[in-house]
């Protein structure tokens, strides 16, 4: 399950870490904020265990011919995957966007963070989206463009909290302590707006009859709890790493609010996170399905489980 709100808030969260998760930028290594989220180096053993990414074909001389741009897998994994192209869907748990692209929530999204967690963002060129803002704007005006774009995705071990590649003339990023404080404030504001059931959109207009908000699914409720927990975390020392965030399990919900069959922990220390299979309605483990660092092929076990239930129902009748 792998880490972006736009601006400091979104980028602190993946693998919410998100938001660690979605982007790895070249960034200025001297910026203190980046030190908090630097991925560990990949060991030779970890790299040797990587399989060729889907779409890579072997050439006549045994050389790999890769018809796609390769990027590092989400989180702190060490293997390569094909990057998402311009216009393709993207989010916290999807492969990164290609070079020069960023994953943006849709401009009309009321909850950009949730949209990105659900993989409902779009890979767009930096500056094309309405949410885009320069790193300086985001850093100096935490209240402006708070739901901005995500950092550029390069095959790099550094996670740039403020977006984009590094370069001379960029202002130093603010401390991790300040960034987490801004993140906490933004998440709290999102929950407050959710609780209003849409009233904040009425502005000065005459009161309208509002529909009651739809009931939250178990997956959405679990995600809300995780976000609430992050929003109330104690601020770390500004130089202290935020490893405690990695221990959180961020549920992988689909666009309908159901659990995705495959749930995974975030990649860490050069190792892929473990993945397991759950029932899409309840989030409970599917018995017999393995927990592995790879694809447990959950659809096979889910179909088998559903088939067994169907046979049992027929016998009961």
Swiss-Prot record:
BP GO annotations: positive regulation of activated T cell proliferation; regulation of insulin-like growth factor receptor signaling pathway; response to insulin
Lineage: Eukaryota, Metazoa, Chordata, Craniata, Vertebrata
Free-text note on domains in this protein's UniProt record: The C-terminus is required for IGF-binding and growth inhibition.
IGFBP N-terminal domain sequence ranges: 35-126
Domain of life the protein comes from: Eukaryota
UniProt-annotated stretches for the region Disordered: 126-146, 190-218
Organism: Bos taurus
CDD domains (UniProt xref): TY
Keywords from the UniProt entry: Disulfide bond, Glycoprotein, Growth factor binding, Growth regulation, Secreted, Signal
InterPro entries referenced in this protein's UniProt entry, alphabetically: Growth_fac_rcpt_cys_sf, IGFBP-2, IGFBP-like, IGFBP_1-6_chordata, Insulin_GF-bd_Cys-rich_CS, Thyroglobulin_1, Thyroglobulin_1_sf
Protein known as: Insulin-like growth factor-binding protein 2
Cystine bridges: 39-76, 42-78, 50-79, 68-82, 90-103, 97-123, 219-253, 264-275, 277-298
Domain named Thyroglobulin type-1: residues: 216-298
Cellular component aspect of the GO annotation: extracellular region; extracellular space
Gene3D superfamilies in the cross-refs: 4.10.40.20, Thyroglobulin type-1 (4.10.800.10)
MF annotations from Gene Ontology: insulin-like growth factor I binding; insulin-like growth factor II binding
Changes after translation: Cleaved by MMP9 leading to release of free IGF2 from IGFBP2-IGF2 complex, which contributes to enhance the motility and the growth of astrocytes.
Signal peptide per UniProt: 1-33
Subcellular location: Secreted
Job of this protein: Multifunctional protein that plays a critical role in regulating the availability of IGFs such as IGF1 and IGF2 to their receptors and thereby regulates IGF-mediated cellular processes including proliferation, differentiation, and apoptosis in a cell-type specific manner. Functions coordinately with receptor protein tyrosine phosphatase beta/PTPRB and the IGF1 receptor to regulate IGF1-mediated signaling by stimulating the phosphorylation of PTEN leading to its inactivation and AKT1 activation.
Motif range (Cell attachment site): 293-295
Subunit structure: Interacts with IGF1. Interacts with IGF2. Interacts (via RGD motif) with integrin alpha5/ITGA5; this interaction induces cell migration, adhesion or apoptosis according to the context. Interacts with PTPRB; this interaction leads to PTPRB dimerization and inactivation.
């Amino acid at each position: 399950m792998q880490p972006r709100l736009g601006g400091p808030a979104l980028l602190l969260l993946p693998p919410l870490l998100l938001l660690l998760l979605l982007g790895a930028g070249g960034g200025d290594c001297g910026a203190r904020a980046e030190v908090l989220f630097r991925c560990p180096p990949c060991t030779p053993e970890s790299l040797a265990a990587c399989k060729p990414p889907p779409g890579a074909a072997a050439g006549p001389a045994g050389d790999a011919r890769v018809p796609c741009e390769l990027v590092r897998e989400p989180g702190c994994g060490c293997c390569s995957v094909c990057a998402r192209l311009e216009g393709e869907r993207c989010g916290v748990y999807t492969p990164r966007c290609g070079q020069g692209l960023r994953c943006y929530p849709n401009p009309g999204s009321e909850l950009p963070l949730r949209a990105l967690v659900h993989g409902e963002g779009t890979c767009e060129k930096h500056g094309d989206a309405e949410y885009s803002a320069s790193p300086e704007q985001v850093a100096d005006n935490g209240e402006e463009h708070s739901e901005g774009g995500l950092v550029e995705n390069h095959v790099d071990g550094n996670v740039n909290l403020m977006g984009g590649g590094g370069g001379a003339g960029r202002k130093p990023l603010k401390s991790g302590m300040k960034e987490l404080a801004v993140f906490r404030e933004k998440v709290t504001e999102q929950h407050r707006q959710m609780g209003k059931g849409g009233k904040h959109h009425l502005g000065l207009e005459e009161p309208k009859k509002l529909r009651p908000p739809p009931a939250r699914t178990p997956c959405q409720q679990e995600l809300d709890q995780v976000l609430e927990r992050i929003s109330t975390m104690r601020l770390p020392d500004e130089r202290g790493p935020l490893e405690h965030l990695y221990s959180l399990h961020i549920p992988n919900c689909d666009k309908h609010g159901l659990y995705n069959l495959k749930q995974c922990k975030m990649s860490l220390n050069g190792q892929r996170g473990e993945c397991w299979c759950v029932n899409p309605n309840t989030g409970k483990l599917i018995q017999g399905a393995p927990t592995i660092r790879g694809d447990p092929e959950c659809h096979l076990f889910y179909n088998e489980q559903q088939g067994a239930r169907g046979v049992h129902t027929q016998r009961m009748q």
